[in-house]
Amino acid sequence: MEFHNDFLTNPLRVTLYNPAENEYTKTFIFLGSVPANVLQACRKDLQRTPKDKEILQNFYGKDWEKKLSQYVVGGDSDDLDEFEKLFVEDSGEETNVMMPEIETMYSEYSIFPEDTFKDIREKIYVATGVPPYRQHIFFFQNNALQVTYRLMLSGSGVALDIRDYKKEFQQVGGLNIDATMESQKDELYVEALDSFQLIKNIHHIFVADLNTLVAPMRRQISIAIEDNYQFDLLYYGLIMKYWPLLSPDAFKLLIQSPLQMEKQYPALSPSLTSLKKRLLLEQKLINFTYARAQQVVAKYEGNKLTRGTLAVTSAMIKISPLVNIQINVRNVFDLFPATPDIPQLVVFFYSKTGPTVVSKHHITSTEPEKFSNKTFRVPTIILIRYINKKAFILTIQNNGHYFIESNWSENERHDFNSVVSTLNNFINPIIHTINDMGPAAFPRGGSLPLPSNEDIQISISSMSVSTFWPYTLSSKGFTELKSRWREYEQAGIISVRGLQQTGVYNFLFKKGIYSYDPHEIERMIIISSGPGRKMDINVALLQNTYAYLFDTNVAARWETIYGGRNIRIYHRVTDIKIEMFNITQEEFNYLWVYLFVFLDNLITGPDKIMVNKLSQLHDKQQGKGASQLRALQEQDPDLYDLRKYDTQATVYSVLCQHPRPPVIYSEAEVKSMPPAKRKELVKYWNFTEGVPAYYSCPHPDYPHLSLLEGRHPLNYCLPCCQKTKALLGTKRFYINNTCLTKHTFVEQDLEDLNTQTSRHTLSYGKKIPVNRIAFLPHQIADELFSNTIKEPDIFCIVGVEQTMLGISNAGLFYSLARILDLAPKALAVEIAKAANTPQYYILGNGAGNMFSSGAELANFILQTFVEQKNQLLQWDTAWQDIFLDLVAICYDLHCVFFKDKQGDIEFEVSPSTIQKILSPSKKIAIIFDTNEGIYPMAMTQQKRFLKNSEAQYIFTEEDPVMEVIHSMSEFMCKDGWWDIHDVKNIPGYTVTKKLINRHNFCYALLIVSDTDRPIYFPIRLSSYIHDDIPIDFDLRPTDIASFEETWKFIRLFNKHFKQYEIIPSAVLQNMKKEFVGFLSEGKTGLYFYYAPTQTLPATLEKLPIATLTIDPRDIDQAILYPLEEPYPHQDKANKAFYMNHLYKFLLIEFFDVLYGLQSNTTRKRIEDLFQKTDFQKINSVTEFYTKLSDFVDLNDIHTIKHILETTGADHALKVLQKNVFNFDYILLSPLQSYTYDELCQYLKKLLTPRIEFYEDIETIDRGLINIYTSCQYSTLKQPQCEKKRLRIPVNHFENYINILAADILNPLKHSTLLLTGLGVIDDLQFIMRPQEIISVKNKF
C-alpha cells in the first residue's frame, strides 16, 4: 500500500491568465512543506548560485528546472463535444510553449493528491487573493483542454475555451458575450464537477480571473445590467459559460456591491483569515499522516494480534465491458423465469406506453415489490438470486454494464479478493443463461462478458468494511481518542454530526472523498419535492448544480449526499473496531492509512496516551458483567451469539450469569504470557476463526471451567465457570471431556453416557432438551387419556431439536423423524422422492403450487433440509402441511395435534386425517405444538426410556388411546353435511371414482349401477383417504348420466339421509338452450349436472332458469389445459396474425444479411489504419483519428478511443474486432443509389436464400412469436422458421420485396425500418408461467 505525496517533489504550478489581453500574468508554485534551504533556493529565481541549483537538483531531481519552469503544456483546444479527451495516454511527448517572462511566486501551502478541485480553489484563493467565484480553472490532459464543470446545451456539450474570449464579436457593457447562450438559456445545464475530481497527476493549471474583465468595465456593466435583456445576455453569454459558480443574484451583487460578497455568499467568498487558519491546520495533520504512513503500514498489514484485520460486509462490483454491447433488457426479463433461487426480477424499459417498470416474482418470494419503485436512468433489469440463504443482486443496464452486490456477516471475514471471487461464482450461471438467449437478448450481436474476461474493467464500490486495531483502551483512553479528532474536524478533514453513543465515535470523513454520483443531487431534489408538495428549491438548481454555493436549501441537501463517508469507531473490550460505509476499494486503502496513523499515534511518539490509559491484551482480568460478555462475543461471535442461529434461543448471559463467564485468549496472547499463567489455561476452540482458544476462570468463587451442552443451536459446548471441579467418572466430567475433544455435544453423545445416570422427567410447560421427556398437561393425562394406559407405562412428550440452519421452527421435521425412527436427513431424502410427482401441486392443500414442478419441490426440500442452503422465506409455514402429506403418502402415517399457544389446549386434526381415523386401518402419531416447540408424544416406561430411549410413538386401532382420538375426530366431522363415506353406503350403487381438485380436495364422485354412463354427484370439498376407490385429478366428465338416472339416485339418497335432503332450487341452462343441471338449496348449494337435453324435466318445471353464459368446466379447462382446446377459429386468427407481421419477419432477415455484407469493408480499413499507427507518438495518433473521422462517425471514434485508453495498443485490435459499432448499422444509404426496379431485383437475389417457400401457411402458434429474431439463430422456438429459413407463401414474396424497395428509397422510412431490430411484436405481452406473478407500472 503506497502513500506518497508526489506534489512535494513535483509541485503544482498555477498560472493566472487574462482573457481580455490573452496573456499569462503570474505563476504561483505551491512548494508545500519543503526544507528551508529548498524554499530559499527556489525564491532566488534568477539569482540562484551553483549551490542553490545543487540543492534543488537533489530535492526535485535532474528535471528540477522543468518542474519549476513557466512552460505551458498544450496547443489549440479541441471541440470538447466532439474530441474531448481524444488522445491516448501521454507518453512524455508534449507541445511545450514557453511563456513570456512573468513573475513567479512561491507558496508554502501544500497540495496533496487527495485534494479535489474544490480544495484547489481554496488554496488558490489563499495564495493569489482570487476568491473561488472569480476563478475559471482550465488545464491540459493529453493535449486536450479540460475544465472543472460541464456545460450542456440541449443535452450536448458546449466547448469551453476561455482563450477564445476575444473571438466573440458581440458586446454588452464592454464585455464580449456569446449571444446564442441567452437565446437558448432554458436549455442550458451546468454540472459542477469540482467535488468529484482529484488533482492527482495534474501539475499545471491556469486560472482566468473574472476581475480582469469586470474591474475595468464596472461602470458600463452597472448600466447594462439595469436592462433585463442585457443582463441575461451578459449572464448567460459570459458568466454562466465561464464562471458558473455565480448565480444571477450573486453576479449582480458582485457588480454593484463587491465588498458585500463575503457577507452575503460566504461559500463563494469565505473569510480569508479563517480559511488560512484551517488550511494550515489541515497541512500539519496531513503532513504528519504522510510522514508516518509507510511505518504504520509495515507495522499493521498482516498483523496477527486479532482474528484478521479486514471484513467486507457489503459491496457492489461494477463490470464495464470494453466492447460496445446492446442488450434488450425487456426480452431478457421475459425469457428468464422466476424460480425459488431467483425469485424476483424487475425491468425498466420504454414500452409503447412510455417509461415502464415490470416486476415478476416467484410465489415463494417474500418481497415481491422490491425495486419496483426504484428510480431508473436507463433501461435496466434487476435479478435477485439466493445462494445458501444469502441474497445476491444483479443489475444489468442496456449498454452491457452490470453490477453485482451482496452482504456478508462480519464474522465471515471476506477480503476484497474473496468478495470478487464469491460474486463471480454467483454471476456466472446467470450470464451464461442470458448469453444463450442469443439475438433475442443481443439484437446487434455480442454477449455479456464474464467477470473473468480480459475485455472488461472491474471496480468495487458501495462497500461497508470493518477493520480492527489490535489494542484496547480504557474509558478515559477512548475519551482521549475522541478529543484528538477535534483537530481533524477543525481542519475540515472530518465532520462530526449528531449525538454520540457511549462507546462509539461516529463521524464523516470528507477529505479526498470524491467517488460520488454527480446526478444524485438532482434525484434527491426531485424526490423531496414530491407530488402535491410545493418545491422549496430555487429553480436554478435544475440548471446549475453549483447552486449549493449560493442556495442554503441546496447546500443542506448537498452536504447530506456529498458530506463524506460514514466512519464508526467502536470501543471494545478486546480491540478497537472501525466500520467504514459506502466506500470504494481505493477509498478504503486511503482511509485505512489515515485512521491507523491516527490510532498508532495514541500509543507511540511524544503524544502517546499514558500507559495507565492503555489496556494490555495479555493482562486480561475478570471484568464487569457487560464488558466480559462483550469481550467473549467480540472474539467468538459464532459461539456466544446464540440468536444468530435461532431467534428464540436463550442468550448466553442468562445461561452463564455474572461472575461465571470465563476470560478468552488467542494463541498470540498466550505466547506472550508468563509460563505460570499459561499453565492455568484450558485449551478449547474458537468457532468463528477455526483455531484454538484458551480460557481461564479468574474469579475466586468460580475457578473451574465447565462446558454447557444442549444450549447452542449448533450443539457447540458453551464455556462457563463453576464452583467445583467435575469429579472423575461423573456425568459432568464425561460431558466436559467430550466437549474439549469434539467441541460439540449431540444426541449420540447422550446415548454414550453411563446408562445409570439418572434424569428426572420434566414438568409440562418447559422447553424440553433433546432426548429428555416431560409429563403431559394434567387435563390431557389425568382426564382425557386417564383410562387409556396402565402403570408402569406413561404418556410423555419427548424433546427433539427445534432449529436448524435457516429454519427457526424445525420441530415438526425432527418430531416426524423421531416418530419414524429415521435420521432427519434420511427422512428428507425419502419425502423428496415422493414429492417428485405430477400431482405435486395438491400437497399441503395446494401449497405445492408454489413450485413449477415436482422436481423443483423435491430439489427445494433437499437444499433446505439436507444441504441446508435455503431459508424458507414465504414457505415458512406451508412446508409443514406439505411434509405431513408426504409422510402420509410414504409411510401411511397421519398426525393429530394438541396445540397450546395461549394456555388453552385445542385438538386439531386435518380433514384427511379424520377420514383415516374413521377408517378401519390407521396409523396415528400425536404431536404437541407449544410455545416452547413442537414435540412428539410417546408411550414408555420411565426407567426404560432413561436406559435406552425406548418408546412407542405410533398408535393403531389396538391402542386404547385411539378410542379417544376416534371419538374426538368423529365429533369434529359432524357438521350437518354428507361426505364420501355417506354416499358409499347407498345400496345398489358403487362409487367408481373420486374427482380431486388442485387443492387436494374431493369435489365430486362418479357413481354407477346398471347404467353405462356414470352419475355425476357433487359433494362438499372433502378430504379423502387412499382406499380402493380410484382418484382422478381431472375435470367433470362430459359423458354423464341423464337427468332421470341422476334423479333416481338422488331420491334414494334423500330416503336414506333425510337430514341431508337434496332439493333443487334452480334449473341450469347453457347458451344452446339445453338443460344441463340444477342448483340445490342452501348457502353451500351444489351444482348437479346431467347429460344435456332440450326438454325441461317435469320435476324441475316450476323452478327458475339460470343461464350459464360460460360452463364452469370450460373455465377449469382453460386453467388446467390452456393450449389443448383452442377456440374454434383460432387457426384462422393465428394465420391472419402471422400474415400481418410477416413483413417484420422479412425485415429482420434483410438486416441480418446486410450486417454481414457492409461492416466488413469498414473494419478492414480500420485494421489497416491501426497497423500503420505508432501509438507512442502524438502526431501519429492525431493522424490516426483524423483519417478515421473520414469514414467513421463521432460515436464510434469515442468507442475506439475508450478501447485504446483502457486496454493499451497491444490488446486494442483484438477488442476492436469483437466490438459492435454504429457503422455496422449504416446499412440503407448505399442501396439508395439503385433505381426501384434494380433494387427489387437486388433484394430478391439477396433474400431468396433466406426463404422457405410454401403454397400456403398452415397453423401458426402466435403465442410463440412475440419475440422474434432472424431464422439463422436457434435460441428461440420460432414457428415462422423452418430449416433456418423464413416461411413465406410463394405468392406473397414479390409483394413484400416491392414494399421493402419502396421503403428503402423513402428517406422518411429509415427510422421505422431500423426499429424492427427490437424483435418484439407486443412489448407488454409477457410469457405467463404458472409460478410467476407479473405486475406492470408506468413511470411518468
Curated annotation (Swiss-Prot):
**Cellular component per GO, a single term:** virion component
State the compartments where it is located: Virion
**Domain of life, source organism:** Viruses
The alphabetized UniProt keywords are: Transcription, Transcription regulation, Virion
Hey, which family's this protein in? Belongs to the asfivirus G1340L family.
According to its UniProt entry, the function of this protein is described as: Putative initation factor.
Q: What is this protein's name? A: Early transcription factor large subunit homolog
The organism's lineage is: Viruses, Varidnaviria, Bamfordvirae, Nucleocytoviricota, Pokkesviricetes
